[in-house]
Structure formats: C-alpha cells, structure tokens
Amino acid sequence: MVRVAIDAMGGDFGPAPIVEGTLLALNEKDFIPFLVGNKEIIEPLIPQKYKKTLEIIDCKDFIKMEEGASSAIRRKDSSIYVATELAKEGKVDALVSAGHSGATMSLATLRIGRIEGASRPAICAIMPRQDGKQSLILDAGANVDCKPEHLYEFALMGYEYSKNVMGYENPRIGLLSNGEEESKGNELTKSAFSRLKTLKGFVGNVEGHNIFDGSTEVIVCDGFVGNIVLKTSEGVAESITTLIKNFVKVSLTGVVGALFMKNVFKKLKKRMDYAEYGGAPLLGVNGNVIICHGKSNAKAIKNAIFQALTSVDQKINENIIKAFASHPSKE
C-alpha cells in the first residue's frame, strides 16, 4: 500500500484542514498516511475510528510562511524537514505539503536529490482549460533563471506527467512566447526552440491564451514567467468572480437572473477552483512531491493526496528517467 507523508503544520490555517483532507482521502482510497507535526495538536483532530489507519510523526517545530527558505535546512525538527527525511529514507512513497513552498523545494532538492538526468527540478502547475480538461505549465516558480537545456528538460518531464498521470495519449508541447512565429521571443526562448523542435509533440511557440484554449497540454517557460502567469491567472479568476457578484447585486433583474443561472455559476466556480486540482508536483526530484497552496482547504489536500497516489501508481519518475536517457540534454 502506498505510504504518504503529509506536512500537517505548514498551511495558512494550521493542521485542521490538512487533517480533514487526509481523512476525506482515506474515505475514498486505500493508503497509509503519516501526519507529520505536533502530536498534541494533531491527535485531538482525529476521530477514534481513524487512529489505527494513520500514523502521527511527532515534531514540535515548523517553518512559518514569513521565514526564509534557507532556514529550513538547519531546522531538523521542523515538520517539512522530518517529512522530507521520511521520503529520502524510503519510509514513504510520496510527500504532500501546504507549507512554505521554498522550504519544500529546497529540502526536496538537497535532501531527496534529483533524478538521473535532471539538472533542475520544476514546479508543474495545473491550469483549467475551456474544454473542461487541464493543461500544465512548468516551470511555475522553482527556477527564475534558466538555460535552454532546462526548458528542454521541463518539456520532457511535462510530457511524461501529462501522458502517464493525466492520461493524454499524445500530449502537445508549446514554448510560451510573445508570438507564435519561430522568430518571436527572447534569447532564451529562441535558443530553446531549436532544441524543443526535435521532441515528439512540440507544436512551436504558444501565447498566453493557449494555456486555456485546449490547443496545448504542456506549456514550457522559465520559473520567473511561469510564476507570474500562475499568480496573474489566480488574480483574474478572483476578479471575475467579484465582478459578477457586484453586477448581480446592482438590480433586482440581476438577482433574479442569478437565481436562474445558479447551476451555471456553480459549475464555473468548480472549474476555476484551485482545490479541484490539488497541488503542483515538483518534477525532477528523486521522489513524489506535491506542493499545495498555503491556503489549501480540505478538498485541496484530498486531491493533492490523490495526485501523489497516481504519481506513485503510474511510476512517473521511472518514466521521466527513461525519457532523459533517450533524450539527453546537452548542458
């Protein structure tokens, strides 16, 4: 049975939604959860019937969001450090954390290490599409400065994740740029283009709107651009929701119309809700690591655990290693 370490302490709202999400996941799938954190706080949140189906790994410290990621390597009693060590030592098959993302990335890279062929890990963000499916964008924040070889590796990792975990038979890869023509872009994207066009599934340069229109499954960029795209998308989604609510309240007609559109709004909200997608896999490390939003609710944690289980079941790292072996980068 798959074993999953869950950092119970690092989220914005404390351990309650993390524990709840773990229990929701247990109700639907079989796995062994290791909740890592302060046992005195975690244990009262667990109903008696679940206490024999999970294990609490007691540690008193945790990395706060406002602290620097560099402090994590010295804080060996912190929840994310202890959870990472479980993964490093092979005591768990996957790690899920809604804590300090910088600390999670640093520890996963330094303590678990990188898989053979990966020079940089990448955060793989899942984005909603107009056709009801999802696309991937990577890197979404792990590497602000990249070389063309890194984008080539990101494309390989994204292709394998999209194919093996998300179920796309023939994923299409696009290079995020400021125009579709090969001549568009900066020095990085132009150099990367010549490498990427040798890959199966590469469709060329894509623009921001292609992330959502269903024309591409894997969108490749450096972490600086990717993180801006991710945060901008979140902001636009929140703004649209707020604007709709404000316009509805302006008149009685708006209120009545909203009642008739209630089911449509529910479906729209679900499609745009980050909790539906769980978290972002950190690809390129020698383990299955899922990084969740700090404000993750129980549903998001549940779905992040499901992501981790699928990654393990589909042997995503083994598939990425094979891809690197047959398509070596030339850094």
Curated annotation (Swiss-Prot):
It catalyses: a fatty acyl-[ACP] + phosphate = an acyl phosphate + holo-[ACP]. Signal peptide: none annotated. GO terms for molecular function: phosphate:acyl-[acyl carrier protein] acyltransferase activity. Disulfide bonds: none annotated. Pathway: Lipid metabolism; phospholipid metabolism. Its main location: cytoplasm. This is Phosphate acyltransferase. It comes from Wolinella succinogenes (strain ATCC 29543 / DSM 1740 / CCUG 13145 / JCM 31913 / LMG 7466 / NCTC 11488 / FDC 602W) (Vibrio succinogenes). The gene is plsX.
